[in-house]
C-alpha cells in the first residue's frame, strides 16, 4: 500500500502550566481511517494543532521520514499535510471549479478565471469526480449545501496532493444522507492516504472508522477497532460516568421460618 503514516511519540502541549496534550503516542498507518474521539477538552484539536504547527509542542511527530515539530505552518502544508475545520473555508463568490483551480495552483490569472474553458486539469477533474461535485462545477460555492461545501474543501486538499488529511468534525450539522455520503468519501480517499478525523458523532464513527483512538485529559485512554474501544470499561466510564457492570445475578429465594 502506498502512502506515508503518521507517528507521534510523547507529544506534549502546555499552555500557562496547563497540559492539554500529555505524552500522546500514536501510530496511524497508510490506508487507515482513524477517528479521534473523546469528551470536550480531551486534547483532540490541540493534538492536530501541534501536528500542523499551529501550537508549540515537545516530543516527536513524523510523517513518513519527515519531522514536523518546529516547522512553520506553511512548510508543513508543503509536505503534503492539510486540514479542514468545522466551518468550511471556500471562496463563496467563485465557482466550484475556480476554487479547485486556485487550490491546485493551476496558474490561471484572475481574468482567465472568469472565463469558462473546455480543458480541465487531470487532478481537478479527478477531485470533482471523487467528491461527487462534477455536475456542480460551474455553481458558485456560496450556493452549495453545507455538506457539499465540506466536500469541496476536501477536494481542494486532494488537488494539492495532500497525503495526510486531518479533518475536524467533518459531518457536524449535516443531514443523514450527507453524513453517509461523507463517510463513503472518506473511505475512498483513505485507501492510499492517511486520514485522521476528529469526531463527536458516535453513530458516524461506528459506521465508518477503521480504527479509533480515545483521548481523555490529554492522554490516549484506549485504542483499537470500534468493537474493541466500545468494550473497554475505561471508555464506558468516561462516557457514561461509570464502568459497565455485569447484570446482577437473580435473587435466590430464601425460606423464612414462620414464628411459633
Labelled PLM ranges:
Residues 2-260:
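Glycine-rich phosphate-binding loops of nucleotide-dependent enzymes
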